[in-house]
Amino acid sequence: MKFFNREKEIEEILHIIESEPQRINFIFGSINSGKTALINEIINNRLNKDKYVVFYFDLREIFISKYDDFIEVLFEEYEEPFIDKVKRLFLSLIKDYPDVIKSYALLNITGVVDSIPIPKNTLNELLKKRNVKNVFRYITSVLIKIKREGKQPIIIIDELQKIGDLKLNGFLIYELFNYFVSLTKHKHLCHVFCLSSDSLFIERVYNEAMLEGRCKYILVDDFDRETALKFMDFLAKENNINLTNEDKELIYNYVGGKPIDIIYVINEMKYKKLEDILTSMLKEETQKLKYFLENVKEEDEELYKKVVDALKIFKDSYEIEDIKIPKKLREFLVKKNILFLNPIEGTLKPQSFLVWNAIKRIL
């Protein structure tokens, strides 16, 4: 399927990439709002592969519980050519020697890659010493080599919050943030983009004193009504489906501007009635919310009452000011993916129109 819209966000991100690295860039939004699709469109179709080298680390489907997992995500080992081994051994005997080794693996990095090449023996050393500073030192050396070849390195980490609680002499995430600040604000060496649908993680970052003035936040939200209707027309044409204005309004009233939900509806329309599709989707979301509330009630009657009172606020409004719901309660509802928090704007809303409609139906 062709990529649709997001020209405003694309223009903003390309402007960042074409400028000198200055800040850590956080791309955030509700679940399935199109963050990954956006960044993939940019790195695969909008960048000159001869000018940029993108290291794209997708943590979405990777279980990371220890240091070794983190290292394996970052690096891909290769056998170091014999001549490089000899050079490194010889130069290691010379004090303050310049970095002149140019590995074939490093010189041939181009376009988008999902790991950083590393000699097998170097990787073994990193795993053995378990010192994150050595890891960052090696990455920096790779980035410098790329820069010397006239290319701009870019690091992208999708779902960064997955290492948020990983400890290695303190929380690894803080070591990583310090390193990213060094790469961007201090050395101006590499662009850094972090994607996340975890709005509590973004709130934690936003309130982190060490990152003040060192980050930029880019919201990739669900489509607004006008864009959502155009997206439906786009998909209908792609799939040779006839959509009336009434059909489009009905779809929007059920699923709003959530791209993945609109795509699902249009695909299902190839062999199902629109009303049946939407009724089924809302029924499923309503059942999930009903069982969630049932579980809360069984575990804590008092919490259940507070949750119900909080969700009732959304019967009349899709979006509210965040402080209308007490902090611990809103964090609970955000963690359970019922609500989405935008800490930059200070707003709360259901994760999707489907969730919103389920809230209104149950309460």
Curated annotation (Swiss-Prot):
It comes from the Archaea. Pfam families: ATPase_2, MJ1010-like_2nd. Keywords: ATP-binding, Nucleotide-binding. The keyword Nucleotide-binding applies. This is Uncharacterized ATP-binding protein MJ0632. It comes from Methanocaldococcus jannaschii (strain ATCC 43067 / DSM 2661 / JAL-1 / JCM 10045 / NBRC 100440). PANTHER family: ATPASE DOMAIN-CONTAINING PROTEIN (PTHR34301:SF8), DNA-BINDING PROTEIN-RELATED (PTHR34301). Belongs to the archaeal ATPase family. ATP binds at residues 29-36. InterPro entries: ATPase_dom, MJ1010-like_2nd, P-loop_NTPase, WH-like_DNA-bd_sf. GO terms for molecular function: ATP binding.
